[in-house]
Amino acid sequence: MKIIHILGMLLVALVVKAASPIEGLLERIDKGASRKFMIEQVKSPVDFFELDQKGDKVVIRGNNYVSIATGLNWYLKYHVGIHLSWNGMQAELPEVLPAVKQKERHETDMKYRYDFNYCTFSYTMAFWDWTRWEKEIDWMALHGINLPLAMVGTDGVWYNVLSKLGYTKEEINDFVAGPGFQAWWLMNNLEGWGGPNPDSWYKQQIALQKRIVKRMREYGIEPVFPGYSGMVPHNAKEKLGLNVSDPGLWNGYRRPAFLQPTDPRFEEIASLYYKEMNKLYGKADYYSMDPFHEGGSVAGVDLDAAGKAIMQAMKKNNPKAVWVAQAWQANPRPQMIGNLEAGDLIVLDLFAESRPQWGDPASTWYRKDGFGQHDWIYCMLLNYGGNVGLHGKLKHVIDEFYKAKESPFGKTLKGVGMTMEGSENNPVMFELLTELPWCPQRFDKDQWLREYTVARYGKSNPTVQDAWILLSNSIYNCPDANTQQGTHESVFCARPTEHPYQVSSWSEMKDYYDPNDVIRAAAMMVSVADEFKGNNNLEYD
């Protein structure tokens, strides 16, 4: 019996080992790849990864699964010439992997690597299924992301909350937005638009979010759930007798009402919300809340009391939880966060590459005191509206990050974040951003690009490298002070007019670069395309 017990324990150990998220990741990249690596997890007070060699095995070592996955990605890029990207998350690894000749270590003091904007869930991800989400979570882990917004299935939470408050199915569907508009609904900008949603939609999204959160937690990725910040349907005063304020209109859309923190039912409804969230997806350690987004009226609202009530409700649900807030336009209001304890709030400097609020005096959104005592994350927004086109500030993103890090505000800088409105574009910019935490010192843009091209295309080619340098000095060199919202848009998409200038309301059409440089760079890449036949990354670019 003792032998049988020991054998059983060994079998369990083998099953647990096989269930490692890193092994699963490797097998999804290339079947059989997990046999070519040794994975070692080592305790450390800081996030780190090491690349090493033991016999014929490449060793990836790190303090957690996300660090290890980041190390794996680093090895594939800079030792094998394999770049896993949105346009291709699978690759055929060499039968014999290139040996790590000298142990290589990278560590970071950037605790958080954030991902997603609310808008990403509507512009890009509204109809993703588990197959697509699984690839994205793998992409996150490979790029060191450990703090992503996770708002799929929040509509199911609200459905349950409002049902318990006495709302009918029809009334609930008048409040919950349709899939393509839930970003703005959850930012308190509108309600009901794009609905109603069928019952099957709620069930489908709840099931999907459970799988998403399960996989994130297997990696050790901390999901950021939408928290409760006072949003209620616009008719909550008439329906429930609540004391609410009217945040007004957002671009002509009626906003949900804001439940006053002094209303005795604020705590009750917040508790109900968190209870229903916990029931479906478990407790989170991070909650995103963004009341009064983009000009919401605060008339009649005690902002200090509101901030404290929102924080208190979240802490009652989970005493160690942290509020994640977006710095966008006037938010977060200083009066709302000024008296909150340090360590209880993280601020996402959402558009830090163009309109930083961390305390850079050169910014048009300059905040003299930055975010005060609160931790913050340096974010790159880059994409607006899901528009696809070449765009970026390659050199400036590097310079602004280290400028912030070296400033007095650097002591509260705790990470980097991707806050694009639309995903799956301009991979070079996001590759750069996600490497920043692992590079302790400022580095040369051109040298980084040369190494990037080798990683992305699998071999060195001077013509391709020169093409990318040309792009980095033209279309990827948007001026530092330029605040345009993403890529240029084609005037062929504009409403017909005698003198078309803009496509969308906030687009910028004036060239900041010479279009001939982009044409030359494209011609250079085409001239050597035959050398890269079958390389999906070059074909995509």
Regions found by a protein language model. Name each.
Residues 1-20:
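Bacterial Sec-dependent N-terminal signal peptides
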Residues 18-110:
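Contiguous, structured surface segment used for ligand recognition
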Residues 27-28, 70-79, 142-143, 427-438, ...:
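Short, hydrophobic/amphipathic alpha-helical patches that form generic packing surfaces
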Residues 48-50, 126-135:
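Short, polar loop/linker segments at the starts of domains and inter-domain junctions
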Residues 57-62, 122-127, 199-200:
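Second-shell loop/turn segments in exported
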Residues 83, 87-97, 116-120, 141, ...:
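Catalytic-core regions of glycoside hydrolase
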Residues 110-129, 140:
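Active-site-adjacent substrate/metal-binding segments within catalytic domains
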Residues 497-541:
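Acidic, low-complexity N-terminal propeptides/linkers enriched in Ser/Thr/Asp/Gly that mediate export
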